[in-house]
Each structure stands twice: as C-alpha cells, then as structure tokens.
Regions:
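RNase H catalytic domain
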Residues: 57, 64-136, 141
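Surface-exposed beta-loop interaction hotspot
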Residues: 129-167
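Acidic helix/loop or adjacent segment enriched in Glu/Asp that either coordinates divalent metal
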Residues: 38-70
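A short, surface-exposed interaction/processing loop segment used at functional sites
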Residues: 240-297
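RNase H-like nuclease fold core
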Residues: 1-47
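Compact soluble domain cores
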Residues: 152-228, 294-297
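Exposed beta-strand-loop-beta-strand "reactive/processing" segments of non-cytosolic proteins
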Residues: 219-251
Length: 297
C-alpha cells in the first residue's frame, strides 16, 4: 500500500499562506492532519504559493517526520497544488539532465531535497483536495527564509552535517553504483531503476558516518588543476567500497555541501600514500599509472 502526504495552500496576507495537510497511512479514510502558516521571505515576488507548499512538505518530512524516522521516498505519494513542482521532479528528466522540466529556477532549487533524499516518491498535482475527517489535528507556524532548506547527512569526520546536492547523488549512482567510466555516459541514467538513487543516498549516509572515512589533501605541485568550483573543496576518501570513492565537499553560506562524487582513480591530484614495492616507496600516482598501463597491455 502507498502512503499519501497531501498539502494545500491558501493565501492569507502578503507572502503568508495557510497550509492544510494530511497524512494517509495506507490510504486510510481517517488520516492525521493539521494546519499551519508559512511566511515566505519578502524578497520572493513570484511563485510564493508553490514555495510555501515546498516549505510545508520539507517541514512535514524533515522536521515533523510524519512518515516515520529514517524513511526515504519509496512508497510515498506527495499531493500538492502546483504543476511547476511536479515538473521539477519528473524522473526521466532528472535522470538525463539532473534537472526537471520546470523553467522556474527557484522552484527547482527548493525541490532539491525531493530530488535527492526522496527521489523515490511520486509527486502529483491535486488542485481540489477532498474534505475529510482527521483522526488527530495539529497546528503550528513556520517560515521560509531566503535560503531553501536542504536534506543533510551527518559527517563524523568533519563534525558537521553535509547537504547532498543532486549532482553529487547522481554522480554516486553513475560512477560508484553503476560503475560508469565513460564521461559521455554519465548524464544518461534513464535505464537506472529509481531504487538505485535511494540506495545512493543510503550509501552516502553510511560512508559519511563511517570511521573509515579519511580526508585527503591536494598534492603540492600537482599539475592537475581542480575545477574552479571546487577550488576551496575538501576531499573525503572512502576506500572500503567496491569502487573506492572520493566525496568532494565545499562550504557555502548555508553550510557544507557535497558537490560531486569521484572514483578514487580520478583523483590523482590528491596526495595519496606511497606504495611499498620491493625495498622502496613508489609514489601512488606512478604506481597507479604503471598498473593501468600493465592492465592495458
């Protein structure tokens, strides 16, 4: 059986909305539900209602946990009022471009947590929700500031939470889960089952909490120039994986963000420990280059 989270907004002032919500466990006819007010930042001049519903969905899933602790999107239907939200989360488009179909950037940004942690959820438009009797009813009051809330995972190594970008999750699916190595094939994940994206989230949750995660430094004098967007990044290496990986994190105004996930063999610009060969130490980059050449011969 599928569970349904439904939200409906009504304007009740300048960038202020009344939200009525319900949670139907196994599509019960007597759901739990409630209402609250969402105040959207005054800088928002368009799509305030859609952003208010996104903030409401985030609150219900990430703060109130109406669906249960540690649950992802599989088996959940999210009913809301705006076509732009649904378009921003179309699975086929997400799997081929990393973006949905919507042209509204702020809605796509606000939907980041649904495109990552809750990838498996089904998002629909329900402009005319049914009248219902609630099993229980809760009221509260929240606000949406300029920074959209993000789904985060705790990282033991750095002692902070890390937001997971959709690019990082999708690169984990492509490079680590699906073992895709050809650059031209990384962006087309249309044949990958939805479940693998949620498995990617679980993988990130596991390795970021692992005591086997190690931070690596960029090798001094490295000829490899890291991409500009990762110039101030930190590199977290996890070797205990079928495909050893490096999670690239950076800090923005809201905190730490996982920007991408690399295979360890892509990160030769890092200062890897030397290998012992016979009676001498061989720099890791030279050892790996020799091994790759030997494999090709």
């Amino acid at each position: 059986m599928i569970d349904t989270l439904a939200v409906k907004s009504e304007p009740c002032g300048q960038n202020r909305f009344s939200i009525v919500w319900s949670w139907h466990k196994n599509n019960t006819k007597n759901p739990i539900g409630g209402s609250f007010y969402v105040t959207v930042d005054s800088s928002v001049t368009e799509d305030a209602g859609a952003l208010a519903e996104m903030r409401a969905i985030y609150y219900l899933l990430e703060e109130a946990h109406v669906h249960g602790a540690n649950r992802l999107g599989n088996g959940i239907c999210i009913e809301q009022s705006f076509g732009a939200i649904r378009k921003s989360l179309l699975k086929k488009s997400l799997k081929t471009s990393g973006l949905g179909k919507t042209q509204k950037a702020q809605i796509a940004n606000a939907a980041e947590f649904l495109a990552t942690k809750y990838f498996g959820a089904v998002v629909t438009v329900n402009a005319k929700p049914k009248e219902m009797t609630f099993k229980s009813y809760v009221e509260s009051d929240i606000e949406l500031k300029q920074d959209y809330p993000r789904a985060e995972l705790p990282c033991t190594l750095i002692g902070a939470d890390i937001a997971i970008s959709r690019h990082a999750l999708y690169r984990q699916v492509a490079r680590i889960d699906q073992k895709i190595t050809h650059p031209n094939l990384l962006d087309d994940l249309s044949d990958v089952p939805d479940a693998r994206f949620e498995a990617g989230w679980v993988w990130l949750r596991r390795i970021l909490a692992s005591d086997k995660l190690q931070e690596m430094q960029v090798r001094k004098g490295s000829a490899h120039k890291t991409p500009q967007q990762y110039a101030s990044a930190r590199y977290l290496h996890f070797a205990d994986s079928e495909v050893p990986a490096v999670v690239v994190i950076d800090e923005d105004a809201s905190g730490w963000v996982a920007k991408t996930v690399l295979r360890a063999d892509q990160a030769q610009f890092l200062d890897w420990p030397a290998y012992v060969v016979g009676q001498r130490l061989v720099p890791a980059r030279i050892f790996e280059r020799h091994r790759q050449n030997k494999d090709r011969s």
